């Protein structure tokens, strides 16, 4: 069954030279792949099989996605905010405060069909100057947020994770997956989505000694996630159905 998803077993190296390759995001109307090279403080792009810089400096952007108008939506460690980049590469701040306090360092992000923006906020970008700017946490904890760009309303979705990291909806948006990459927790969890809330947190997989970082859902509801030496695939029943070993770690 798993092999039926794979059209090829060939790896194609798109680019070599990033310190960390994070947040790959495809922008359909541009036929362009964008990703972050976080410690190098830049973003890269792939167009017509050619790689070049998309933005430098990027203010230490990390996770990326697109909104429903195919604008690029990015988490910025350096800005401690969420950015929107339009077709002309104009960058604007979407949201940068929680109750008047700076975010920690928004890490990963997804956009729902109702235009709401969901993102995780661990402190990795403020722990040192390596992937952001060393700074202090201004609120206690590491939350998962939901921002409505139409009403400008920001809501906390959960406070119950140690270091929330990767985040993605299932294809039907009935489930929300969130990775926790805390010191003693390297797990992927799934929540049921009920209106504007998430409930019924369940464990999908414990990845120790590795962890699940970025992931996305396919149209069949399978979750494809980075996980140490492999890309692992879980079906909608949270069962591991296969993995692809990668040649580089």
Residue spans for each PLM region:
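Beta-propeller fold detector
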Residues: 12-13, 52-57, 92-96, 155-158, ...
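Loop/turn-rich, solvent-exposed surfaces of beta-rich toroidal or solenoidal domains
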Residues: 184-192, 197-239
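Short loop/turn segments that connect beta-strands within beta-propeller blades
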Residues: 46-50, 86-90, 148-152, 192-196, ...
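Short, solvent-exposed loop/turn segments at conserved positions within beta-propeller repeat blades
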Residues: 38-39, 77-78, 126-141, 181-186
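A short helix->beta-strand "capping" segment at the edge of beta-propeller domains
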Residues: 1-19, 46-49, 201-203
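Blade/loop signatures of beta-propeller domains
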Residues: 1-12, 29, 40, 138-141
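A short loop-to-beta-strand structural motif that recurs across blades of beta-propeller domains
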Residues: 42-44, 81-83, 143-145, 187-189, ...
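Beta-rich, blade/repeat-based domains predominating
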Residues: 16-31, 57-76, 80-81, 99-117, ...
